[in-house]
Amino acid sequence: MVNEFDKLKAGKLLLASANMLESSFKRTVLVVCEHNERGSLAFILNRPMEFKVCEAVSGFEEVEERLHMGGPVEVDTVHFLHSRGDLIDGSLEILPGIFWGGDKNELSYLLNTGVMMPSEIRFFLGYAGWSAGQLEAEFEEGAWYTAEASKDIIFSDAYERMWGRTVRSKGGEYQIVANSPELPGLN
């Protein structure tokens, strides 16, 4: 496996390697929203929580979609990805057609009036963050891979299969990695 840190940028996927056993990131798929000389910020895509947005986020009482654990940093903050940057001021495009953040009051209004559908948004509690040099060191240790992101992956509900499918899509030796058991020592 090669160190793919140089390929990392906003809009890419970050895939936990099969060697990543730390529970917060084991077999996770994250979308990178910010990556620069100060560090990196991403959201875990395949860690849905048991409760719904309407149960945890004020102003979004009509949103029956599940809330997602974005990462272990600042878990008392709410973040969102969406596909309607044309309607929400302050949105940052992280890849074509996918936006991070923006005005939460506008978002609430657009959802409550039916202009936007809940399927166009993914809500997260917290985020995954790395300071300068930290993520690069983890890549050097073989903890992460990268992959191309897409709207289909970001808004997918196939949580259980997301990591395996995404790693497998890289081809070659990654197909073997994707099929490896979670705890090979128990075989």
From Swiss-Prot:
What's one Pfam family the UniProt record gives for this protein?
Answer: DUF179
Q: Which GO terms describe its cellular component?
A: cytosol
Give the residue spans that cross the bilayer. Answer: none
Q: Which domain of life is it from?
A: Bacteria
Family stated for the protein in its record: Belongs to the UPF0301 (AlgH) family.
This protein's name: UPF0301 protein Ppha_2142
Organism equals: Pelodictyon phaeoclathratiforme (strain DSM 5477 / BU-1)
Kindly list the organism's lineage. Answer: Bacteria, Pseudomonadati, Chlorobiota, Chlorobiia, Chlorobiales
